[in-house]
């Protein structure tokens, strides 16, 4: 009887520990995801300012574009199943409609790739490609992100 009780208690403790570890892992993934999205936002902002001639070094424009292209390839991977948290800006639709989300991310990746292809072009072409990428970003945010 005593061994059974100890076994039950250990099972409960281990299950609770595993659940806590899963939640911590989901929180870490969410923090990483938020870092990636903030980095994308930062590079987007830098591109807007440089293209508008308001701030920044035009010689660094290609660096910001390359960073976005690199980060874009990671977006789909930072939303694994089980990483949705209640206080996250990510809507459950990401996981409920994984195929639709993957398609939206693919549109963003394609637009980021097109922008990357323009990195050495003139500012007007870069601006046009950047605006197209912005539409892809907005499309994803409208369906899969909590309103700001």
Predicted regions and their residues:
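Short, intrinsically disordered, low-complexity terminal segments
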Residues: 15-18, 22
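Short Cys/His-rich "knuckle" micro-motifs
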Residues: 148
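A short hydrophobic/aromatic micro-motif that marks alpha-helical segments and, especially, helix-coil
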Residues: 17, 112-113, 137-138
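The canonical Cys-X-X-Cys-His
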Residues: 133-145
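Positively charged n-region of N-terminal signal peptides that target proteins for export
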Residues: 1-4
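A short structural micro-motif
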Residues: 14, 71, 135-136
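Bacterial N-terminal signal peptides
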Residues: 7-15
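Extracytoplasmic c-type cytochrome modules immediately beyond a signal peptide or single-pass transmembrane anchor
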Residues: 22-131
């Amino acid at each position: 009887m005593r061994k059974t009780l100890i076994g039950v208690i250990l099972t409960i403790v281990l299950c609770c520990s595993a659940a806590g570890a899963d939640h911590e892992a989901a929180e870490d993934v969410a923090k990483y995801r938020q870092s990636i999205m903030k980095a994308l936002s930062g590079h987007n902002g830098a591109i807007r300012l440089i293209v508008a001639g308001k701030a920044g070094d035009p010689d660094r424009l290609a660096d910001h574009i390359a960073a976005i292209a690199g980060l874009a390839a990671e977006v789909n991977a930072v939303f694994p199943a089980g990483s949705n948290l209640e206080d996250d800006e990510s809507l459950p639709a990401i996981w409920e409609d994984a195929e639709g989300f993957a398609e939206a991310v693919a549109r963003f990746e394609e637009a980021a790739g097109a922008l990357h292809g323009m990195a050495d072009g003139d500012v007007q072409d870069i601006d046009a490609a950047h605006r197209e990428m912005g539409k892809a970003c907005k499309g994803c945010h409208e369906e899969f992100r909590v309103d700001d």
